[in-house]
């Protein structure tokens, strides 16, 4: 695909006003606060920031592992913002590949959920 074709095909990823809030007891932790990002199909993006700055949360939402609390996420022309759990699983199986930086548990999932996510991703 040449540059002209990739531009006419639209962005590979659009995130607008994305918020992710976790409830921790009676408190709320804001992991993302109105994040905006647009990535072209032929573009490479590096996320750099300190631990706890929201990089993993942003990637997890873009890849359909998490749903945003608010905002819009469009991947390859499909708005996945309000996908059900089943639709997200299908989306990940068809469209997403993850390479995690190390073999660690996902900290915001229970041990059972960590095992189930590996099972779901493997098909």
Model-found features: residue ranges?
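A short, flexible loop at the N-terminus of ABC-type nucleotide-binding domains that lies
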Residues: 8-12, 21-34
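Conserved beta-strand
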Residues: 15-18, 30-40, 71
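ABC ATPase NBD coupling module
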Residues: 26-29, 80-97
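Short beta-strand immediately N-terminal to the Walker A/P-loop
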Residues: 45-46, 98
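The feature captures the beta-strand-to-loop junction immediately N-terminal to the Walker
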Residues: 48-50
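Helix-to-loop junction immediately C-terminal to a conserved catalytic motif
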Residues: 63
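Conserved ABC transporter NBD signature motif
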Residues: 71-79
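Short coil-to-helix segment of the ABC ATPase nucleotide-binding domain corresponding to the Q-loop/switch region
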Residues: 109-119
């Amino acid at each position: 695909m040449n540059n002209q074709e990739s531009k006419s095909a639209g962005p590979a990823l659009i995130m607008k006003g994305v918020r992710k809030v976790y409830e921790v007891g009676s408190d709320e932790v804001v992991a993302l606060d109105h994040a905006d990002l647009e990535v072209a199909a032929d573009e490479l993006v590096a996320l750099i920031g300190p631990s706890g700055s929201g990089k993993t949360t942003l990637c997890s939402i873009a890849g359909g592992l998490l749903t945003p609390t608010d905002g819009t996420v469009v991947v390859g022309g499909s708005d996945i913002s309000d996908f059900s759990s089943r639709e997200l699983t299908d989306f990940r199986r068809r469209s997403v590949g993850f390479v995690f930086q190390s073999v660690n548990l996902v900290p915001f999932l229970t041990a059972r959920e960590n095992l189930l996510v590996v099972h779901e991703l493997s098909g």
